[in-house]
Amino acid sequence: MRSLTIRRPDDWHLHLRDGAMLEGVIGDTSRHFARAIIMPNLVPPVVTTADAEAYRQRILAAVPKGDRFEPLMTLYLTEQTSPDDVEEGKTTGLITAVKLYPAGATTNSHGGVRDLDKAMPVLERMAKIGLPLCVHGEVTTPEVDIFDREAVFIDTVLDPLRRRLPELKVTMEHVTTSDGIDYILSADSNLAGSITTHHLIINRNAILVGGIRPHYYCLPVAKRESHRLALRRAATSGDSRFFLGTDSAPHVDPLKECGCGCAGIYTSINTMSCLAHVFEEDEALERLEAFVSLNGPAWYGLQPNDEMITLVRRDAPVAFPAKIETGAGPVTVFDPMFPIHWDVEAAIQA
């Protein structure tokens, strides 16, 4: 196959940051993606509908002229979150989901939930009104090995929560393990998972073999090869419970290349090209559209995009920049460590 035309994709997990960084990265998403669920872990975090509306306006103001892009806003769940404010956000259409960060699990998560019981009034209201909970599925207790955090979270936090509140709709974000895939597949309803571009491509060797390579460090951290292959099978299967959430997370290089570097990989600029390679390699190009354009909207109760994009397979590898320059500083672009031949040629208006 030399070309593939699909509905314009969406990104169901995206970090845009704010200020100069937002202005520097938004175009890499809006060029290809029609919508994205925007993560709320700013400093300070997006905890109220007023915060979300203000952030939404900043995002829209930064979208390059001519691009059509809709940010889908989320709230950062705290133990003080107001159920009424959450319901108002859902009613007005401002809020697409609420995000659960276990305290300390990832970048700017120190204000997250420590005692889930204190957040139950909000979760119960969300279940009642049909608002999804997006979860960063890792425990942060120091006695748990970092490579086991997801599996332990499922057993000790997520499964008990879903048994307690089975009507709550839950998105397991950036699934990284076969445990997570199997748990989603075992569920009857109200559970789905997003999968990142980079977790389909790298395993933990990318971070550790031949020296520490900080630009492959993210949270949840990449796991062993058997888990990567489980993610590949899920993503390329066409199963409607799995969809793209890039977790593209820009950090300026000095914050990555240091003694205690930040977690995050920047993939927005080359995600569609990388995914076309992955799906072609797994003989599943005909299911790429489901993963990037159809399954996510269906899960979140939205219509697929009317616009289309065309991917073309070039004879020569497509060149992507090693870094992008932003007003905040340089950001290294994800290197998949293979030649990329697929290119997004055109976005077609409906």
UniProtKB/Swiss-Prot annotation:
Top EC group = hydrolase
SUPFAM superfamilies for this protein? Metallo-dependent hydrolases
User: Which reactions are catalysed by this chain?
Assistant: (S)-dihydroorotate + H2O = N-carbamoyl-L-aspartate + H(+)
Residue numbers annotated as active site: D247
Q: Which residues carry this modification: N6-carboxylysine?
A: K99
Checking CDD domains in the record gives: DHOase
Which amino acids does the record list as binding Zn(2+) 1?
Answer: H13, H15, K99, D247
Please list the residues that bind substrate. Answer: H15, L16, R17, N41, H136, L219, H251, A263
Q: Which GO terms describe its biological process?
A: 'de novo' pyrimidine nucleobase biosynthetic process; 'de novo' UMP biosynthetic process
Query: Per the annotation, how and in what number is the cofactor bound?
Result: Binds 2 Zn(2+) ions per subunit.
Any single Gene Ontology cellular-component annotation: cytosol
Return the Pfam families for the record.
Answer: Amidohydro_1
Sites where the protein binds Zn(2+) 2:
K99, H136, H174
Query: What EC number(s) does the entry state?
Result: 3.5.2.3
Instruction: Identify the keywords attached in UniProt to this record, alphabetized.
Output: Hydrolase, Metal-binding, Pyrimidine biosynthesis, Zinc
- A GO molecular-function annotation: dihydroorotase activity
Obligatory cofactor(s):
Zn(2+)
**Which pathway does the record list?**
Pyrimidine metabolism; UMP biosynthesis via de novo pathway; (S)-dihydroorotate from bicarbonate: step 3/3
Say what the protein does.
Catalyzes the reversible cyclization of carbamoyl aspartate to dihydroorotate.
Assembly notes: Homodimer.
Q: Which family does it belong to?
A: Belongs to the metallo-dependent hydrolases superfamily. DHOase family. Class II DHOase subfamily.
Protein name, entry field:
Dihydroorotase
